[in-house]
Structures are given as C-alpha cells and as structure tokens.
C-alpha cells in the first residue's frame, strides 16, 4: 500500500511537470486523486516483450504490476489480451485528462460513455456529473461485470450496460438525449446514433482514425455535428473493426517476394516522426497503415492495407531507399501522392483539420468546412521510377 501511495504521488507530480493537468478543468486532478488507477486495474496485466504479450500478475510480482499501472504517462496498461491482441486497457493518464477536458462535463449533465473497459473513466465522469448521471456501454460481458464490481467498491454510481457501442444507448435504457457522449475506443466513422442521442448543442468526443482526438458539437436542429481535431490520441479500435494494427504488415505480406522493386532518393523521417503528416495520410488514405523505425542507416517505413497490398521503404547505407511493393495496389505511390497533396495544401497541422457528420455522410476538411479533403487511393505513380 505504501508503494502504491508513493507511485500515485509520483504520477501526479509528473503530470504537473509536463503541464498535463488541464488548467480549465481543475476537477480532473481532484477526481483522479479520489479514484486512483490501481483501484480499477485487474490483478493480471499484460506487457509486450518484443514478440508477444506476457502476463504480469499482481500476486506474483506486485512491483512490476504496480510499475505497469503507474508507468509512462503516455502508455496505456493492457488489461486484456485475446488471440494475441490487446483488446482492453487502462488508458494513459495524459490522454484521459485531455479527453475529459475536451468533453467539458458539468455537474448534472447526462453522459453516455462507449467502452466501459475497467470502469475507471466512467467513475471519473460520475465524479463530475453526479450520481446516476452516467450510462456506460460495454460489448464484452466479462469486462462489464468486472467494471460493475470495481465501480461498486469505489462508490461510483454508474449504469453499466452490455451492448454495441455503435448503436449508442440501448432503446430500453434511460437518459436520452445526452448532454455529453464520449468514446474510449477509436472509430473510423462516427456512428450517427451518437449524434441522434445527443441534445442540440451537446458534445461528442472520440478518438478517430487511431491518431486524432475529435470534439464535435451537435447543431441546433440536430441534423449534423461538426468540430475540430483536438490533439493526438492512439486508442484501440472498436471490437470487430476492419482497421488492424500496424503489425498487420507481416500478415499481409505473408513472406511473399516483391512484385515491384526499385531504388529512390527520399527523406523518410517525416513519415515516421511528423505526426501532422501522419494524420493527413490517415485522412487521405484511410485504409493504409503506416509503421516506421530508425537505425544507423536511416528510417525505414512499412505500409499495408490490412488485406492484400503492402509496400516497404528500406533505408540503405548509401543514403538511398529500396522501395518494395506487393499486391494489387501500389501503396508507395499512393503515399507519395497523398504526401504531395499535403505539401501543396500548405502542410496543415493536426489542429487545422475538422470533421462534419450528417445522416448521409461524414467528411474531413482543412481550415474551412468547404475545403474537403480528398481520398487518394488510386492512380498513383510509382515512387522514384
């Protein structure tokens, strides 16, 4: 207990050092202190060892377990692994604080949360909104039950429901419309049900595209919602989502030799480290996953579309790049075309992007709603040839 208290204080101090506690929402820091992370962490956590997730049990190694709970402010603690994939986590404190600040919950607000997980975020919401004001939807019955137990132990009055978050509140449940809606998992498309179940002027906050955090305000007539990207946020996708992790590259390539191969002169470092470019590519090429790494030779980048096409840029010791592609699409060319569009548009930053959602469609725009971002997935020329 003494070790946990020390880790809590250190975690709080580090958040203060990086200015992670939002000045506009002082209640968040108080709520976090009242509802510490360890009270919602299961006794088994999971740690990536470079090849697979391995269990870390509290009763076997309490020190390592506590270290995962109160580790980096920028890394989540994995709480469930199914089929080798992480499917639930205790979100990192910095992102939790950012999302709650964006949501702007007020006392008395009716709040819908999609993705209960450990129940910790729902408890923080209830701390602010008040008893009985939060409904949380969880697709996994086991996670939902464990969350109910933890919420009960901490005295948080939250109504946890098993259901599909994409449908929002089950029709038999109370509290429609909601003042605030928040998703704790990433989506590629904001479900219209979320907009329907939010009052005019209400707010929806969700991770989008596995990279950005979007805050939307529902229009006065309830027929649309719009808003801007608020920052970076890397969350797990919705269960059953077609969007796979960057690690899908090995599965998609499946050991096959390249169908196309050539050398090029490119500075690949922005593809790996420039998150403004990375977000733009996520918008322009929504089904292309990008991963990269840097070593003594330079930066290498891997692309895949989660199904049948892949590309790789391998850094060479002479400063050049070996470009390899396989599958029906020329992904290297598609990325180059999208990169050129971003450059020609003035290299818009993450915060320049906005989103509009209607019953018929939704789209991303830059600066003004009329400047609609294209989707560039065909007709690209090979890179460097």
Regions found by a protein language model. Give the residues of each.
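Class I SAM-dependent transferase core
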Residues: 2-112, 121, 143, 317, ...
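Short amphipathic alpha-helical segments enriched in hydrophobics
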Residues: 22, 36-40, 183, 339, ...
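Class I SAM-binding transferase module
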Residues: 182-298, 378-383
């Amino acid at each position: 207990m003494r070790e946990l208290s020390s880790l809590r204080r250190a975690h709080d101090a580090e958040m203060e050092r990086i200015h992670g506690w939002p000045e506009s929402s002082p209640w968040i820091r108080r709520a976090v202190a009242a509802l510490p992370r360890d009270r919602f962490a299961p006794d088994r956590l999971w740690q990536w060892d470079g090849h697979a997730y391995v269990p870390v049990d509290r009763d076997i190694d309490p020190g390592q377990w506590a270290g995962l709970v109160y580790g980096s402010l920028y890394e989540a603690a994995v709480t469930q692994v199914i089929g080798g994939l992480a499917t639930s986590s205790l979100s990192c404190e910095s992102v939790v604080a950012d999302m709650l600040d964006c949501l702007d919950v007020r006392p008395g607000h009716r709040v819908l949360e999609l993705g209960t997980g450990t129940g910790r975020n729902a408890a923080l919401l209830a701390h602010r909104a008040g008893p009985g004001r939060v409904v949380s939807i969880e697709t996994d019955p086991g996670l939902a039950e464990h969350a109910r137990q933890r919420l009960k132990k901490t005295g948080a009055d939250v109504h946890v429901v098993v259901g599909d978050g994409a449908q929002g509140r089950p029709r038999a449940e109370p509290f429609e419309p909601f003042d605030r809606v928040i998703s704790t998992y990433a989506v590629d498309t904001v479900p219209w049900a979320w907009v329907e179940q939010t009052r005019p002027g209400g707010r929806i906050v969700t991770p989008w595209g596995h990279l950005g955090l979007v805050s939307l305000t529902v229009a006065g007539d309830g027929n649309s919602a719009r808003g801007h990207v608020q920052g970076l946020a890397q969350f797990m996708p919705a269960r059953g989502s077609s969007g796979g992790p960057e690690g899908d590259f090995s599965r998609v390539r499946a050991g096959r030799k390249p169908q196309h191969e050539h050398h090029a002169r490119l500075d690949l470092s922005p593809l790996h480290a420039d998150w403004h470019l990375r977000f733009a590519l996520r918008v322009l090429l929504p089904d292309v996953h990008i991963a990269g790494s840097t070593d003594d030779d330079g930066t290498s980048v891997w692309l895949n579309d989660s199904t049948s096409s892949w590309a790789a840029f391998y850094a060479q010791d002479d400063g050049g790049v070996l470009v390899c592609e396989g599958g029906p699409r020329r992904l290297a060319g598609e990325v180059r075309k999208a990169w050129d569009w971003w450059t020609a548009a003035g290299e818009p930053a993450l915060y320049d992007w906005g989103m509009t959602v209607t019953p018929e469609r939704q789209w991303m725009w830059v600066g003004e709603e009329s400047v609609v971002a294209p989707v560039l997935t065909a007709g690209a020329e090979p890179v460097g040839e």
